[in-house]
Amino acid sequence: EVLEDGQPQKIETFKRISVTGTPTGGGEPAREIRSEYVEEAEAAREDVRMFVIFLDDYHVRRGASMAVREPLIRFLQNDLGPLDMVAIMYPLTPVSVVRFSRNRDILAGAINNFLGRKNEYEPRNDLEQQYANYPTETVERIRNQVSLSALKGLVTRLGGMREGRKSVIVVSEGYTYYLPPELRNSQAGISTPGQNGVSSVTGNDPNEFRARMML
């Protein structure tokens, strides 16, 4: 039985689709994605799974980002098939330039470069320079907005690529407006004593060594 808004719907056609990321007998082989045209054509196939790994560097501590690299690369190497398409995105990545790939070496290299910046406020681009003199609490709100807006844009783009399921893997420690007193500063771009631009909240904090992966 299929319901829509609580009302039963008539089933006119039914098709079972089992997708494993591996070509079936007689199926088309995986094509190397070298252009947007090939990307769109491959994404339209029913036997292709699509994944986006969203590396939320604004909300992952440096140590946690290093710890999560290995399990992400294992996922690429062991859990994906040759047909699967994967893209990597950061909060500041324009959704228009997000590209999918089947090259596991390139994807693994990108993951190995992932470095979290949670509680680090040194500006690295013109956008961040604009609010470098804001209080750290304000910067955290801006970072939340940037990250969530990027996810919304990503979901919109994925929805326009084809019907069916797409998966977004969000690597983040979560969103919060709270900062411990030692990280509060009237100017985010100026390091507090003992920080030198890097969060001094390490030690036994378990979040320093763990990032949540949310599907």
Model-assigned labels for residue ranges:
Residues 1-215:
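Scaffold/interface architecture of coatomer-like assemblies
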